[in-house]
């Protein structure tokens, strides 16, 4: 409430909160998450109206920056930090139709991520991406609320089946007892 008052909203404020109309592994019930967020926001004086659209329309409008607050998620498909940090927070991705729907473009972050992209030394690259994560959390263009847990039922006769962190099913080396 104090920060809202300092920002010029001593009596609170109103906003839209867009809820995804689809289920995703990282957010299986966006409407319920939106309701919980709405309740938390109300406690500090922010009245949030939940809105949703058909999925194609939702994504189009989010990418165009029409939202005030909205939900999206990401499932990294290659394990490289660039696939998250640059794709979702980089300046080039902030353009219309990009994946950076927060339209976040902060040069100190951008410089670190662009440098990390081309550094071949793994230790230096790790340090740069760690620095980028600190900047992301300090600037807070959006916040993370969940991480998907993968569960795959496998019969007890199946041996050496391993879950891929990328959601792929690799059967190399898999066998039956």
Feature-to-residue mapping (PLM):
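Short, well-ordered beta-strand elements
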Residues: 12-24, 49, 68-69
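Glycine-rich phosphate/diphosphate-binding loops that line cofactor/substrate pockets in enzymes
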Residues: 8-10
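Short phosphate-binding/catalytic loops that engage adenosine nucleotides
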Residues: 46
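Structural transition elements
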Residues: 1-6, 24-32
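Detector for C-terminal structural segments
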Residues: 21, 28-38, 43, 53-177
């Amino acid at each position: 409430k104090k920060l809202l008052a300092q920002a010029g909203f001593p009596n609170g404020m109103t906003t839209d909160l867009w809820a995804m109309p689809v289920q995703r592994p990282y957010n299986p019930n966006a409407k319920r998450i939106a309701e919980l967020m709405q309740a938390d926001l109300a406690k500090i004086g922010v009245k949030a109206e939940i809105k949703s659209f058909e999925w194609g329309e939702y994504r189009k409008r989010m990418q165009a920056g029409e939202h005030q607050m909205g939900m999206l998620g990401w499932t990294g498909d290659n394990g490289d930090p660039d696939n998250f940090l640059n794709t979702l927070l980089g300046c080039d991705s902030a353009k219309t139709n990009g994946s950076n729907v927060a339209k976040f473009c902060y040069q100190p972050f951008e410089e670190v991520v662009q440098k990390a992209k081309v550094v071949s030394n793994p230790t230096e690259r790790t340090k740069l991406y760690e620095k980028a994560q600190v900047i992301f959390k300090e600037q807070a263009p959006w916040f993370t609320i969940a991480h998907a847990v993968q569960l795959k039922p496998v019969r007890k006769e199946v041996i050496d089946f391993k879950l891929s962190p990328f959601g792929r099913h690799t059967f190399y080396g898999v066998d039956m007892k």
